[in-house]
Amino acid sequence: PNTSLVTEAGLEIGEMRGIKVNDYLQTSDEHIYAVGDAIEFRHPLTDRPWLNYLAGPANRQARIVADNMVFGNKVTYEGAVGTSIAKIFDMTVAASGLPAKRLKQAGIDYLSATIHSGSHAGYYPDALQMSIKITFSPVNGKLLGAQIVGYNGVDKRIDEFSQVIKHNGTVYDLMALEQAYAPPFSSAKDPVAVAGYVAGNILSGKMKPLYWRELQAADLSKVTLVDVRTPDEFALGALKGAVNIPLDDMRERMKEFPQDKPVYLYCGVGLRGYLASNILLQNGFGEVRNLIGGLKLYKAATAPLPKPKEFSNSGSSSSDSSKVDHSEHSKDSAEAYTIASSVIPSMKAIKVDACGISCPGPIMKLKKSMEELADGERLEIV
């Protein structure tokens, strides 16, 4: 922050190079108060000074200073956990508290959970998935941070996470929150509660998590990697080295799971992998781990980032380090675009709305619609 005037005035600067203030927002000169982006104040979670560039806390600080200047130092400032939100085209991204990167920098132990849940009930029109990641203490489940990427309803969910973090709540408090529910606005199991349930399962030992970085670095010759999705989903793309044993067939195919290796399970978003892990554990298997966030998170996290010059040719890829099999998508994009451009205008479009359908619903609906396509028709899915 620009604190040159403060330095010239002889006021104390903190270790983050912000204006150092006390709980009443007084500077080193008791007659001078300071608020806003240029002050540094201890973070409620780390108890270490930090800079918070947000308008909400700044305005609250101004109210506190006004009260203290008029009535004497009676109101203290408790600090901000840093709740922010931004709109990027049609998407909304939001965060509160400390993400994994900040926790690592601070040397704080943590666990994390990632879910993909609908913005409202799936049977009500226009439900869209949001991805939520929370970080929490492995000791007592204290909620440390939350991040959300989605379309609708991101704002109200991040506000709920923020309140739990601000009041030193735990992932168990997420399960107990009472939200307004009706199908257009939420689900009977709100995404905030679902995040709490997943974190609770990790803490209780009901599910041993497998994080995408661990899977990326794993020696697959020493583990059994199992895709528990349907055969149709598996055929559309799977992780290299995975065998397909659908969740519904597991009990009949139990002998296909080797007992002498750890079993790594994954599905689309994590739910079926969790159910499959319980089946294996109840049948005496030792180390069984479920990929947190499922294939959706793994593909998003390991996809190569395009370079600026590649935006004009999105079909090319400069990296093959991902374990995701992209062989179905390796055709020359320019040729495909030329062919498509010449034939699409004359085709009849069949539109399929798969919004709000939980997996494997969209895949099954797409497959059924493809089977019903007549010659000269094209399929559009949203």
Question: PLM ranges: what are they?
Answer:
Residues 152-170:
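A short, polar/charged loop-to-alpha-helix boundary motif
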Residues 1-67, 160, 164:
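FAD-site-proximal beta/loop scaffold in flavoenzymes
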Residues 142, 258-262, 372-379:
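Short, surface-exposed connector motifs at secondary-structure boundaries
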Residues 40, 230, 249, 356:
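Short, glycine/acidic-enriched loop or turn micro-motifs at the edges of active sites
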Residues 172-183, 187-224, 231-264, 268-346:
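Rhodanese-like catalytic fold shared by cysteine-dependent sulfurtransferases
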